[in-house]
């Protein structure tokens, strides 16, 4: 039996985009910082890293689709923060963002990591953006790095 898995190390020539929503920027800024830290720690070249900002999580799928369609990127790390409020808006935005991101990834068969927080309150979001529960932006970039490696291994 052969075990095939990705490595947590960039080759240094991968072109990566971090796609981040600005809404709830207190959280998404920390996620973005975590993703950038992970990228640097694992051999990424900052000259090959683009940061793309959109107004909110609902806009992430459209711009992800455009980034993947461009053919300029080897992978995209998608970050956002959707925090439940008093209306059904949370349910609609989180469902459509999630479906749209997955759809774009499968449409282009490209590595995409999902670092969009969906939390019940601001405290949970803060915990996942660098406090008690680690930094989900860092984790999303780690996932992308492994996916890039695994896809390359499967291609060879």
Swiss-Prot record:
Chain sites annotated for binding (2S)-2-hydroxy-3-oxobutyl phosphate: 86-87, 128
Biochemical pathway:
Cofactor biosynthesis; riboflavin biosynthesis; riboflavin from 2-hydroxy-3-oxobutyl phosphate and 5-amino-6-(D-ribitylamino)uracil: step 1/2
Entry similarity comment: Belongs to the DMRL synthase family.
Name the chain's protein. 6,7-dimethyl-8-ribityllumazine synthase
What this protein catalyses is: (2S)-2-hydroxy-3-oxobutyl phosphate + 5-amino-6-(D-ribitylamino)uracil = 6,7-dimethyl-8-(1-D-ribityl)lumazine + phosphate + 2 H2O + H(+)
What Gene Ontology cellular component terms go with this record?
cytosol; riboflavin synthase complex
Chain positions recorded as 5-amino-6-(D-ribitylamino)uracil binding sites: 23, 57-59, 81-83, 114
- Top-level EC class as recorded in UniProt: transferase
GO MF terms, alphabetically ordered: 6,7-dimethyl-8-ribityllumazine synthase activity
| Pfam families the UniProt entry points to | DMRL_synthase
Any single biological process term in GO: riboflavin biosynthetic process
Catalytic residues in the record:
89
Q: What this chain does, per the record? A: Catalyzes the formation of 6,7-dimethyl-8-ribityllumazine by condensation of 5-amino-6-(D-ribitylamino)uracil with 3,4-dihydroxy-2-butanone 4-phosphate. This is the penultimate step in the biosynthesis of riboflavin.
Keywords, in A-Z order: Riboflavin biosynthesis, Transferase
Matching InterPro entries: LS, LS/RS, LS/RS_sf
